[in-house]
Amino acid sequence: MSRRQFTSRLRSLVRRLRLAPRSVVAAVRDRLERVAVAARAVVAAGRDRPERVVAAVLALAVGGLVYYLAIDLFPYHSVNDDEGVYLYQAAMLLEGKLFLRPGDIPWEAVRPWFFVVDEVGGEVRMYSKYSPVAPAVFAIGRLLGDWNIALGLVAAATAGGVYLLGSAAFDRRVGLLAVPILAGSPLFLLTSATFFSYAPATMLNVAFAAAYVRAARTGSRRWGAAAGTAVGVAFFCRPYTAVLFALPFIGHTLASLDVAWRRSGWSPGFRGVLGRSLAIALPGAAFVGVTLAYNAVVTGDPFLFPYAAFAPNDGIGFGTREILNYEREYTPALAADVTERIVEYFFTEWVAAGLLGTALAAVGVLAALWRERGRSGPGAIARFDPAAGMGSGEVAAVLFAVLPSVFLGEAYFWGTHNGLRNGLIDLLGPFYHFDALVPVAVFGAAGVAFLVRGAGSLLRSVTTRRRARIALLVGLVVSAPVVASAEAAVVEGPFAANERRTDSLEATYEPFEDRSFDDALVFTPDPYGDWQAHPFQYLRSGGGYDGDVVYATDGSPERDLAVLAATNRTAYRFTYRGDWTGAYFPVNSELRRLRVLEGESVRATTTVGVPAAASSTSVRVETPEGYARYSVPDAARTNDTVRVEWTIGPDAARAENLVYEGGSRFRDVPLADGGAEVDLVVTFVGVGGSSVTYRQEVTIDGDADGGVRAVWPPETRVCRLTTECGYEGTWVGPDGDYVDGVSVAMDARVAS
């Protein structure tokens, strides 16, 4: 085409456009404007992308930090044994089970902590008092190779949601700042690094809030359905917690419907608000139905929650409240006192930087009010347009309303009082108020942004932009140590307290390090009664009683023998010497292989060391049917030890090499019918009446086809000033050391 031809065609096209109908011109103009809008959107997305990448990196870093704390600070879990409940339930879900069925094993020996016992058709089954939602989340970590991975994922997801909420309530920079402020909260770090339902429930609540805001801004029913699903699952996870968090959003929804109806009636605008509200409500209601259906399956009554089946008086409301052996009259006055204490505790010791962080959050609230100063007043309602989307001021107001909803709502629940009483809140923070960290993080970030921007604006008004930036940077550097000091002050205490208990737990579980089991049975102590994994929640049988190891609580001789017979596994006894103080102080633990000796009789030899300054010795053989008392002849004594040779037969037990002095019956102490216990008690008395006692307890079965079965070695304990040695009495001396001269050696054989 020649230059002349091109010029001619261009002129012809221009003439046609001039003569074209206005509609065509308008269409072209509209198309060009759309292209321009799309181009601006692409440019804006390009600008936003770096902040979104930073937000993703921060969220992943938070998840990594929580994962590290889980494996470093809580390798044996915390001293709150509820973790074992959730992990038991998670293991059950991985095996497709809602119930534990002990079969022929006495259920009292293998009942996990906080499990409800139910008997259906003559079969005993047990289920957790907790919802299966959090255990299902934790099971994801196990599927990925490590239970703790789930904790990191939950923390990362929560941090990402807080970024979105901060961005919606203020801007993306506030959203970015909210993530490290959230991660700087001791309550967030410690609770997120443990296997409780609080962090997963908050993750679901934050997902609900973020989806709700998106639905309200875009009118998208899909986002509404996502919000409803999230809050419905949160209700299934922790019903009361979900309701308290959702109340401000429910209020916003009702206000939006009311304003839209009053303003335009059955208009497209009202129908849009109603449609997204129903999109939220219907999935939420559906999961309420799922919750009730789960109740019906496990408790037999859709309105009886497993929580209430375990402890009917352990719930919300005033009046008599009770769980296990603790009962209290929970009154409004007590609730007010507890709430006052927990508010102070929460805002001074468990948020990022303590009082400084609380002050920054207060500044953030003032910043939100300052931003709305021109839009508040009588005309605010008139400007409130639900059909136009949810403004940043509305998001900030709803987030702020979460604070009174949580604190006032939890005042109606006595659990906070119980947590303060038993010391768990001192170690792990006010975990019932975990949701309150979300608005605190967002408003804390807003406070930081407001102060920095205000300082920058002030500096730019009195000096050059470059000098203002330098001065602002210097100010941030100078203030950093103050912030770090405030953060260290709130983190140091609870972290050190939990680290101390982890050190004690490490000593407790030392016998299990680098040890694997195959078809084993391990008897565990019972300092808190017949509960498995309480307090030793690190030792769990898994999702059933057919795995590599079954843990059973040590009990009566009859029950222990029944457990041995029902399991037919290689048996061990895990025990300890010392006073169990909730892992505040360490104990000396021991894991011993058990043998079942069976024959016409069992002949045992026990050699004990003579404590320093001992002046006399007495020996007793005891059974439930009586006792015999013996003196020690010279032949059984050396300068440093006393040797006792004793025999356990099918009908009686006695000391062979000692001199009989008397007792409840005869030299031979009769055995009880069936399973029983034979105790050898050697007591040394010193000057002034001080004493040291050795006590050995042997579980025996005297009905073994005319012979006897004995579980060997016996439980051996040493104590001072009493002959009834418990676990707590086995530390001898002021620092947990035995008195000089104490030692124990034993051996046994079967006589046919």
Regions found by a protein language model. Name each.
Residues 40, 55, 250, 285, ...:
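Signature aromatic-anchored transmembrane alpha helix within multi-pass, membrane-resident enzymes
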Residues 158, 344-407, 444-447:
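Hydrophobic, aromatic-rich transmembrane alpha-helices
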Residues 157, 162-187, 203, 217-226:
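Transmembrane-helix signature of polytopic, membrane-embedded enzymes
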Residues 167, 172, 208-223, 234, ...:
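Membrane-interface transmembrane helices that cradle and orient dolichyl/undecaprenyl
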Residues 1-74, 167, 248, 252-260, ...:
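Start-transfer (signal-anchor) and selected internal transmembrane alpha helices
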Residues 187-201, 240:
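Short acidic/glycine- and proline-prone juxtamembrane loop motifs at membrane-interface regions
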